[in-house]
């Protein structure tokens, strides 16, 4: 590892690896590759079928609690839940989010270390999926986000701000503009839904940006195995824990397993 290593982040693993680069980066990451990551967060939880009112009602209830102390310390998805739909929710994100708000350097006091470490990357590769439905907005994979309520001109909440027109890029909060000027940012699209890695998608990345010598098929299958721990499974576990804690009857402070 003295010469560094290439890092691949699947789904939420993408922003967590970026957090490693920004905060530590020892040993150093050479090329950072993210598949379907939520670099600018998500504005709604995935999982409900279209028209499923009960499911949507439950999810909306959980979304309203994403910035509670319990959620911020126990739920993985809460670390990158960035709700820009309502001014009150966005203010909660700014005040209480413990991860994404920090690694995106969105606060008034910028961490120069984050920018310095990102600039050490040789390549930062971001892959999105053409039929993405899990990540909302899907452009979050490329650092695009819905405009925050403070800067919206009207009530339209579904217009995304591209990376290169965002303040994060223009003011170079985490070094992306520097990487772009150097030709070190790469944006790719793979056909399919969230985390459907087709052979062409694998070849695009694993035969171009990762590893020396090239990855063989066995290595790619091992990497794909990690992907099978899906975002849905993690969210389901988190929601079950959250439901027990948030909806526990008053006065029932005992922790037990039945």
Give names to the regions the model predicted.
Residues 252-258:
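Non-transmembrane, juxtamembrane loop and terminal tail segments
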Residues 1-91, 134:
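Serine-dependent carboxylesterase/thioesterase catalytic core
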Residues 113-247, 258:
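C-terminal catalytic-base region of ester-bond hydrolases, centering on the histidine
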Residues 73-138:
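Serine-hydrolase catalytic core
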